[in-house]
Curated annotation (Swiss-Prot):
This is RING-H2 finger protein ATL63. Its EC number is 2.3.2.27. The lineage of its organism: Eukaryota, Viridiplantae, Streptophyta, Embryophyta, Tracheophyta. GO terms for biological process: cellular response to osmotic stress; protein ubiquitination; regulation of endocytosis; regulation of reactive oxygen species biosynthetic process; regulation of response to salt stress. It is found in: Membrane. It catalyses: S-ubiquitinyl-[E2 ubiquitin-conjugating enzyme]-L-cysteine + [acceptor protein]-L-lysine = [E2 ubiquitin-conjugating enzyme]-L-cysteine + N(6)-ubiquitinyl-[acceptor protein]-L-lysine.
Amino acid sequence: MSEEDGGSMSVKSSLSSFLKILSSYNSNVLLAALVFLLLVVLFVLLLHFYARFFWSPSHQDFSAAARHRRRRRRNRRRTVTTTRIIPSLPLGGFDDGVSSPAATATRDDKGLDSSVISSIPLFVYEENEEEEDEEEECVICLGLWEAGDFGRKLRNCGHGFHVECIDMWLSSHSTCPLCRSPVLAAVSDEENLKLAVNAVEEEAEVRLQMSPAGENESNVSGDRRVSLSLSVMEDDLKTGDDDGEEEVRIEVFDDDEEINDGGTRSDRRRSMSMTSSASSSLMRMLSSSSSRSERNKVFPTARQDSSK
């Protein structure tokens, strides 16, 4: 019996020691499994929040709009830099000491006067049924042309733009925004020097039908001839001042004779001064009236010789 009891005790002790070893091993494995599970749950939560805030459609639309705004701002800066710095080059390349009028206008671009801009002819856009597939757009505002839109067509190059767009452009530029050709015909320095040194005189002759107040046209005794003489003054050239306007002297010669104190007769003569812009308007009015009178064959204009 003693041997059997000793054998059973040894078996129990070995089993208890094995169970202790196994329990200690299971606790370490369980702890490692719990730590790994917590890491997996934390990673899944982070992935969920990332997908919710960065992959949502609203955030994608906001990001696309922000990228579009940055792209437009970058393209706008690039366009302005190209317009202001890079001049248009002649087709033949650079010539020694010679620059094209378009390049000169680009470097010294100060815009045009409002009266010059308003003189550019207008047109009304009409859609062409044969070219419906090709949509035309204004290169300044990048807007499509629609039927009934008003535009201006430049004389030299023939390009057309919206009235509001080209008026704003020409207020600070003097060239075409598409081909960079000058809007106004370039005048050489030699011609400018001749205009500044020599007094330019232009004469226009008109006839005025004068009748006293209260009388009929049948009682008109005759015609009255008035001769206008326009001359550009040289005061700006002598003094060195340049205010952008030339003074023009207008002398009016009247055929009606007046008697002086000595009993002699002399023609009436009056003179006045005005700016060159006002005188040019007066000359255009006189030329239009003279052309109408020539068409009607009534008192054709005649240019008097200054020597007489």
